[in-house]
Amino acid sequence: MKTKEIRNLSDQDLQKQLEQSKSELFNLRFQLATGQLENPMMIGLVKKDIARIKTIIRERELNIGKEA
């Protein structure tokens, strides 16, 4: 997910997306442990998405990037 797409989401949608991404990461790690994961690169991509979402949530908490 692109940063611009994430910024366009509402706070509630961000929380939902964060939970979905965490769930997806859990499933990917489980697949990796059982040897069923075909593309290990997906783990890194999902982790980066989670980091982007958390960054945007924190920016909104601190009101960074908001034009007054």
From Swiss-Prot:
This is Large ribosomal subunit protein uL29. Pfam families: Ribosomal_L29 (PF00831). GO terms for biological process: translation. HAMAP family: Ribosomal_uL29 (MF_00374). GO terms for cellular component: cytosolic large ribosomal subunit. One of its GO terms (molecular function) is structural constituent of ribosome. SUPFAM superfamilies: Ribosomal protein L29 (L29p) (SSF46561). Keywords: Ribonucleoprotein, Ribosomal protein. The keyword Nucleotidyltransferase does not apply. It comes from Finegoldia magna (strain ATCC 29328 / DSM 20472 / WAL 2508) (Peptostreptococcus magnus). Belongs to the universal ribosomal protein uL29 family. InterPro entries: Ribosomal_protein_uL29 (IPR050063), Ribosomal_uL29 (IPR001854), Ribosomal_uL29_CS (IPR018254), Ribosomal_uL29_sf (IPR036049).
